Amino acid sequence: MRKYVFDAKKTKDEIVEWIRNYFRVNGPGCNAIIGISGGKDSTVVAALCCEALGKDRVIGVLMPQGVQDDIDVAREVVKYLDIQSFEINIGETVNKLLQAGRTGGIVDSHQARVNLPARIRMATLFMVSQSMNGRVSNNCNASESYIGWATIGGDAFGQFSPLGKLTVTEVKKIGFELGLPEKFIKKAPSDGLTGKTDEDNFGFTYEFLDHYIRTGDFDNDVETAAKIDKMHDANTFKEMPMPTFNPNCCEWGW
């Protein structure tokens, strides 16, 4: 079993400085554009950006799909953080794009329907970003990424990723270190697409997954460890940079 120690305060301070450095180099004076779902990841990212940049440079974007019961939590988050926010309902856009595809002869798959809202949300974030002098955050965590629980072109995208190398367990600890209310940190993670919690979809808990990722220990639960390994192996392509052909005729300086 691998040795594992996590210092939440030290890590929080390092992320704050990392965000400052990112904007210093890649967007002096730019705003952080954050899709706010009401879950712990987007809430923690927003709070970190507030500490790093000041709340006046943090903009939350709420993107419910039609009537969405938990959107009130996202509204509470932006009110608690006292940040500027916009609410843009993507329901009509999703439906119209699906209908346009069907009119054009596309028989849309279940996976296409499930992942389309995430992709529309990311397009929406970049629309807001280019209108508000921003840089779009990626709110994924290491637990999700390890098993491919993210949508290419959707929540897996963005321009800077404060939590991408932190597990769900670690993100929660960062949230408490930031002094965020427990209701924001302990809200059951869901995919935001099917109405199920992440753990319902997985068939195992984040606690088990995070412990396995960090230590390699699976407490003799061979079946669950094998399931995690299979999900990881099947989704590593999501973490790879886009393969690009490089011609031999010339040397590129970048």
Q: How would you label these PLM feature ranges?
A:
Residues 39:
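Conserved G/P- and acidic residue-centered "switch" motifs that form tight phosphate/ATP-binding loops
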Residues 1-34, 48, 56-59, 66, ...:
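ATP/NTP-dependent adenylation/nucleotidyl-transfer catalytic domains that generate, transfer
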Residues 42, 63-65:
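Extended, folded domain segments that form the structural surfaces/walls around functional sites
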Residues 51:
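Primarily recognizes the serine-hydrolase "nucleophile elbow" in alpha/beta-hydrolase
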Residues 42-46, 71-75:
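Short, surface-exposed alpha-helical segments at coil->helix boundaries
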Residues 119-123:
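Catalytic-core regions of hydrolytic enzymes
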